[in-house]
Design a protein with these regions (language model features):
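Conserved NTPase motor "head" modules and their coupling/switch loops across ABC/AAA+ ATPases, GTPases
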Residues: 32-167
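Extended, charged alpha-helical "arm/stalk" segments used for dimerization and assembly
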Residues: 1-22, 169
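Secondary-structure edge/capping motif, primarily at the C-terminal ends of alpha-helices
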Residues: 23-31
Length: 169
């Protein structure tokens, strides 16, 4: 829906894979000297921060478009029985990914894997301020998903000017 998003996402994933390979080898004590690993990790983190910030910004913009529609759809489906809300569960504030990556660098070296970034973020779907994945019934969960799908279709139509077809089973 957003031009350039897919290319940015692919760059992020490629750099993340390189970083995780370096961290795995570091945890096993393989290959490069420690100083060289640290320098390479800083370069990878700089690129991850740039791509991750751009992706998070697009995700937030899309959620601003999607959330009101999804919540209105749910209110209509449930006849106002519960209030749905959506929260972007971010690990960092906008502009804060580079600092978070620096802060967690030593921990990541010990763990042998990436511990933070946009790939670890998620949407939280809430019904009456309670997590829907835990507290909602199966029917409520289906209504939440249907509300989101309808909102996605409406958002896609407003962005592209073309109305998608929804196939519901």
């Amino acid at each position: 829906l957003y031009p350039g998003y897919l290319a940015t996402y692919r760059r992020y994933v490629r750099v993340l894979q390189q970083k995780n390979a370096l961290l795995r080898h570091s945890a096993n004590g393989q290959e490069r000297p420690y100083a060289e690993k640290r320098t390479l990790l800083e370069v990878l983190n700089t690129e991850l921060a740039a791509q991750g910030e751009a992706l998070q910004q697009r995700r937030r913009e899309y959620l601003e478009l999607l959330a009101p529609r999804a919540c209105a759809n749910y209110a209509e489906l449930s006849h106002g029985a519960e209030r749905m809300s959506i929260r972007y569960a971010a690990q960092f504030a906008p502009g804060g990914l580079a600092a978070l990556l620096r802060q967690r660098q030593e921990e990541e070296l010990r763990a042998g894997q990436s511990l933070c970034g946009i790939h670890r973020e998620d949407l939280e779907l809430l019904l009456d301020d309670q997590p829907a994945r835990v507290y909602a019934s199966q029917g409520q969960q289906r209504s939440v998903v249907l509300s989101l799908k309808m909102a996605e279709a409406a958002a896609a139509a407003s962005i592209t000017g073309e109305h998608p077809v929804l196939l519901l089973d």
